[in-house]
A protein has these predicted regions:
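FIC/Doc superfamily catalytic core
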Residues: 1-13, 17-29, 34-296
Length: 296
């Protein structure tokens, strides 16, 4: 069978190369094959019928993220989300990589610096966080489970210096007691039971609200099930659940960090601190959606 390139197919069908890639990523071109980052399209393939504008406008954010991820489309909301969520979430936990370095790693899978010393863990965890986001996009519609939560932690911490420590469990619950912000957390022997109870309570609700997702996040952070990486895993979970329930997700940026921490501390006494902080962050993400013309 003779195959054509994306450019040749675009010329044949009189559409853009981007449209051809999107059709292939959506599985609408019979026989199309992806080799590395290059699509090969059968010469006999028929141009898919165009989706009408109404259906296009009804595509959810999750649909767009999945399509752009599959087609490796650069410069869209998937690209933006990967860089912004990874940079800000890692930066909150002490990563010294700049926004530009984070972007460069995502776009080129390399890091170029002169006269600067970088922490290897910062680079590894940045690359790993990109993979975590891919996982939550792929599994956004699945029920939240211990298996998925542990998988996120495994991906995040694989290959780091923590992974070489005997007392550090990569992809599993903590072995040693820890605290967060001077506050006691669940003891290692209590974690499994508390996580099962938290998930059972959360999953018993057929539909989740913005408040339900925040409440789960606070409970998760107070259990602090892992030795390290709880904050990033917790924020990834929130992003996933927002996608699942068609709630506009959000990214806690550096200038919201202290308000976010205060909100975690005060939840249960004054929920407004965390709610308001996350709503501000949500408004910022809505601005991204407006720019990329994605309905919400």
């Amino acid at each position: 069978m003779k195959y054509l390139s994306v450019a040749e197919t675009a010329a044949k069908w009189q559409i853009s190369e981007r449209s051809v890639r999107n059709y292939c990523a959506q599985g609408r071109v019979q026989g199309a094959e992806l080799h590395g980052r290059v699509w090969s399209i059968p010469k006999t393939a028929v141009k898919p019928e165009r989706v009408n504008k109404i259906k296009q406008s009804e595509r959810s954010l999750l649909n767009v993220l999945q399509e752009e991820k599959a087609s490796r489309y650069a410069g869209g909301i998937y690209h933006k989300t990967q860089i912004e969520l990874t940079y800000n979430s890692n930066h909150m936990e002490g990563s010294r990589l700049t926004h530009e370095q984070t972007r460069y790693i995502f776009e080129t899978n390399t890091i170029g610096v002169e006269n600067e010393v970088l922490n290897v863990d910062d680079v590894i965890e940045t690359a790993n966080h990109f993979r975590c986001i891919d996982l939550l996009i792929d599994k956004a519609k699945t029920a939240l489970s211990e298996k998925l939560i542990k998988e996120l932690h495994f991906i995040l911490k694989t290959g780091t210096s923590d992974a070489r420590k005997d007392w550090f469990a990569v992809g599993d619950y903590k072995k040693l007691p820890n605290e967060v912000g001077g506050r006691d957390t669940a003891l290692p022997e209590e974690v499994s039971e508390q996580m099962r109870a938290l998930l059972a309570k959360y999953n018993a609700k057929k539909s989740k609200t913005f408040k339900d997702i925040l409440d789960f996040h606070v409970c998760f952070e107070r259990i602090h099930p892992f030795q390290d990486g709880n904050g990033r895993v917790g924020r990834l979970i929130m992003f996933k659940e927002c996608l699942k329930y068609n709630i506009v997700p959000f990214i806690i940026e550096d200038n919201l960090k202290m308000f976010y921490y205060r909100g975690l501390k005060e939840w249960g006494k004054e929920n407004g601190f965390l709610m308001d902080t996350c709503l501000v962050a949500q408004d910022r993400y809505k601005a991204y959606l407006d720019y990329f013309r994605i309905a919400y």
